[in-house]
């Protein structure tokens, strides 16, 4: 049995505050990692943690996120998958990253989400809708609704979850790299 890692993220900011008001939990972003240290993790979100207006598919860098949001908190789950599922998901994530500028954040979909109506525009996702679709298509998880209606709250409420970390992002960064004087200088995309 292999593992995939889902991170629920609590960050500050106006957009985060609005999402928090709608979904009623603090964790407003979700990312998927192929490893426990989040060296290779992906999501649909900000292309640069410092600029909220440009969003799409990206490889996340926990060190850059920590620089932008020093008070960010993470809750990390390990979920079971087969070796073949993990290989397939890794391939799909890397292909999406290779074509990352073809994937965009689905602003319009947020209004449909609020209305409870499924909506899909090609290559446009929220962080949770992308992850829900990927995990469902690879038979790792299923949700009782259309992938476009899945929110971080649905990941928060997963029944089969093994919490492996909950706390400040700084602690997760230190677990991944115990030399804190180094990580703020890592270039974007490495982690």
Residue positions per predicted region:
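Cysteine-nucleophile amide-bond enzymes
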Residues: 1-191
């Amino acid at each position: 049995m292999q593992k995939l890692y889902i991170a629920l993220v609590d960050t500050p900011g106006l957009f985060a505050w609005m999402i928090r008001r709608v979904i009623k939990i603090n964790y407003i972003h979700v990312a998927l990692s192929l490893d426990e240290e989040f060296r290779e993790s992906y999501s649909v979100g900000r292309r640069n943690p410092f600029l909220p207006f440009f969003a799409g598919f990206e490889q996340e860098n926990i060190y850059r996120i920590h620089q932008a949001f020093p008070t960010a908190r993470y809750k990390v789950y390990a979920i079971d998958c087969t070796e073949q599922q993990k290989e397939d998901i890794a391939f799909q994530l890397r292909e999406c990253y290779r074509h990352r500028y073809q994937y965009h954040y689905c602003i319009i979909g947020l209004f449909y989400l609020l209305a409870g109506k499924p909506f899909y525009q090609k290559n446009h996702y929220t962080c949770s809708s992308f992850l829900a679709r990927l995990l469902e298509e690879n038979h790792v998880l299923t949700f009782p609704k259309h992938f476009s209606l899945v929110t971080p709250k649905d990941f928060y409420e997963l029944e089969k979850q093994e919490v492996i970390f909950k706390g400040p992002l700084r602690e997760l960064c230190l677990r991944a790299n115990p030399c804190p004087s180094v990580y703020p200088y890592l270039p974007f995309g490495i982690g």
